A protein has these predicted regions:
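A structured beta-alpha segment of the ubiquitous adenosine-cofactor-binding alpha/beta core
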Residues: 424-458, 464-466
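Glycine-rich phosphate-binding loop and adjoining beta1-alpha1-beta2 segment
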Residues: 397-433
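Glycine-rich adenosine-cofactor-binding loop
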Residues: 356-401
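N-terminal beta-strand/alpha-helix entry module and adjacent surface
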Residues: 599-657
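Adenosine-phosphate binding glycine-rich loop
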Residues: 486-599
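Glycine/serine-rich phosphate-binding loop and adjoining beta1-alpha1 elements at the start
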Residues: 149-366
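Compact alpha/beta protein-protein interaction domains typified by the UBC
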Residues: 24-109, 113, 158-159
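ADP-ribose/adenylate-binding Rossmann-like module
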Residues: 459-503
């Protein structure tokens, strides 16, 4: 579609009064290059931005997929090399997110407008404003060389946080290798490495074939160009200007090999750890005045690894041989191309959680117990993991059966195995820092018989939809309700389109069983707004006689609903319930109703709350009498009125409690 692009650009030039000039067109290898000249005389430079001449020339490269894909824009000079969003010194990065920012309907008019906006911002030095996600210096990497997940913050370890003379600093990344993937687990100084070696505290192998090794991290206090060097010679030259000469660079690589050899890491063969180095430079933001480290990594080619091994093994006593090996190493730096590795940032200091502002952030750092690992409990447990809980324990005595696979997150290989065990195994793979624990105990006769053991949790989620479990929780928490964790009990309606979650805070009079009783009473005659359909589904009157039995024999009746419906409803109930926990004005007892049916009208979710009751202990200790505070006040008022009107000897009908 280069003809379309050329025609649009020609029409723009004709009506631009000379501001846009089409100078030439060249088509080669399926790409059309349109050379244009733009009037940029009105764009002023400020804040160290790029300098523009009265007119600037650009090469617009149009592919066969135009206008579905945006054209690329290059310049013929390198005057703007080193500027943010200028790659390879000539390529202008106009779109941070083309799928959002490029509109095919705008065509060349939209491209020229975007280019003009880019030039204005580049001249004003505003291409990387504070608070925007970082566009780092560009290192052209490939997954074939491996990828690195960086997890620990560097914080004050960087040399540019103090006013001292130190411009270069060497640290070591303690890494775990799984295939081509490398995880940086922590940063260590050289002395810490030595101390751990002496203490035999550095292991070379872990579980499931994980290999551990050390890789050097060189931190320099000045930013490199926006494109990182493509050859070892250019990188070595850049590092030399910042205080790390070629001999020191080679020494860094050699020392890393010596350390890994001492640890016992495999350095040769298919299972060898990579000879690699990480480079850290100051990023240009995140907040004003704060310079965080931007990290890249490069992998030595096989010859480079062999040379560093030679440098390690040659004896200083063999002066001539050592000099020849050193010359060989310098020669290698001169011709070796850098193999940049892909970096995946997971450092909290430079990344932002994608769930920022979500109610589920309340779960971060919490210890959570999930009872039941079915269509309700399994999705909730997974949401807890992704929300950042510090501990998760799941309990279910049931086994995975073929019929549940259509709506519960298990697979064919899980059939016959315990649900909780299989769920915990899968969820433990989501995060590197958390192992989910499980139990197949009977919740009523096992878990709830030791209530004190449950006080370690911040939240208990009852996803069993089992009345026996709900009653068991009421009894277990009765004597220690002030210390009992916040508890969510949830259940689905008969078609998994409606559901209710109850929330009881620490110290609440009742939990799920009691709150559902209150809810059924309060919605029985005149249901509050939004509750009628929910009440008819969950508390049918008369009770529903037709039940769904999925398997022959004595299988338990259940609801109907697909995986999409159960996952959506479970997530909606969890978000709504946690919103109550995160609020500051929640009643001690709350019920949340979620109606996801297509025909629903009115507010959703809907919410009812109750204050604590007055609790009167039974003399036998077997019962607990709970009286609504308002009802108790009315009873007292009536008994006092009766005494006053009828006298103290009149039978009150049991109202004098």
């Amino acid at each position: 579609m280069s003809e379309l692009a050329q025609r649009q650009l020609t029409e723009l030039a004709e009506i631009s009064d000379g501001a846009i000039q089409l100078l030439g067109t060249v088509t080669e290898s399926g790409l059309t290059t349109l050379t244009v000249s733009l009037d940029t005389s009105g764009i002023e430079t400020a804040n160290g931005g790029i300098r523009l001449r009265a007119r600037e020339r650009f090469e617009i490269i149009v592919g066969p997929s135009f206008p579905d894909l945006h054209p690329d824009v290059n310049v013929a000079h390198r005057r703007w090399a080193g500027t943010p969003h200028v790659q390879w010194g000539r390529h202008l990065c106009l779109y941070a997110a083309p799928s959002v920012e490029w509109n095919p309907a705008d065509g060349m008019r939209g491209l020229i407008a975007r280019l003009n906006l880019w030039l204005q911002r580049a001249a004003a030095g505003e291409l990387d404003p504070a608070g925007r996600p970082l566009h780092p210096p560009v290192a052209y990497h490939s997954y074939k060389h491996g990828w690195v997940v960086v997890r620990p913050d560097l914080g004050d370890l960087v040399p540019w946080t103090n006013a001292g003379p130190e411009r270069v600093k060497l640290l070591y990344a303690w890494c775990a290798k799984r295939g081509k993937r490398i995880d940086v687990l922590e940063w260590l100084t050289r002395q810490q490495i030595i101390d751990r070696l002496v203490a035999d505290d550095l292991r070379a192998q872990g579980e499931n074939g994980v290999a551990y090794f050390a890789a050097p991290l060189v931190l320099i206090s000045d930013t490199l160009e926006m494109e990182y060097p493509t050859t070892a010679a250019l990188l070595a030259g850049a590092l030399d200007t910042y205080g790390l000469n070629r001999d020191e660079l080679l020494r860094v690589l050699v020392n890393a090999r010596i350390i890994n050899k001492a640890i016992g890491v495999t350095l040769e063969g298919d299972d060898a750890v990579p000879a690699m180095m990480l480079l850290g430079t100051p990023a240009r933001r995140l907040e004003p005045g704060v310079l965080l480290a931007h990290i890249t990594a490069w992998h030595l080619d096989d010859l480079g690894a062999d040379i560093t091994d030679l440098l390690q093994e040659v004896s200083p006593e063999h002066v001539e041989l050592a000099a020849r090996v050193r010359k060989l190493a310098h020669d290698w730096l001169g011709f070796a191309r850098l193999q940049w590795m892909v970096i995946h940032e997971a450092r909290p200091e430079v990344t932002r959680r994608r769930d920022a502002g979500s109610p589920l952030q309340w779960l971060a750092g919490k210890r959570v117990l999930v009872l039941g690992c079915g269509a309700l409990g399994a999705p909730i447990a997974e949401q807890c993991i992704r929300a950042g809980v510090a501990q998760l324990h799941v309990i279910d005595k049931g086994a995975v059966t073929p019929g549940i696979l259509l709506r519960q997150p298990y697979e064919d290989a899980d059939i016959g195995y315990n649900k909780a065990e299989r769920l915990a195994t899968r969820l433990s793979r989501i995060r590197h820092d958390l192992t989910v624990t499980s139990s197949s105990a009977n919740i009523v006769t096992g878990t709830l018989t030791d209530p004190a053991d449950l006080l370690q949790y911040d939240l208990i989620v009852d996803a069993t939809a089992d009345i026996g479990v709900r009653v068991g929780i009421e009894r277990a928490r009765g004597a220690i309700r002030a210390e009992w964790p916040a508890t969510i009990s949830a259940l689905f309606g008969h078609t998994a389109q409606r559901g209710v979650a109850t929330i009881s805070l620490p110290g609440a009079t009742g939990s799920g069983h009691d709150i559902l009783r209150r809810l059924s009473i309060d919605t029985a005659i005149t249901a509050p707004a939004g509750w009628k359909d929910l009440a008819d589904d969950l508390f049918p009157n008369p009770p529903r006689t037709e039940r769904f039995f999925p398997e022959p024999g004595c299988s338990a009746p259940t609801f109907t609903g697909s995986a999409a419906e159960t996952a959506a409803l479970a997530s909606a109930l969890l978000v709504s319930a946690v919103s109550v926990l995160a609020s500051t004005d929640a009643e001690p007892m709350t019920a949340i109703g979620c109606d996801l049916s297509p025909e629903v009208r009115g507010p959703r979710p809907v919410r009812l709350g109750w204050r604590n009751d007055v609790i009167l202990p039974d003399k036998t200790g077997n019962y607990e009498v709970r009286i609504n505070a308002r009802a108790l006040a009315e009873l007292r008022t009536e008994t006092r009125r009766g005494r006053r009107v009828r006298g103290g000897r009149i039978e009150t009908g049991g109202m004098l409690l």
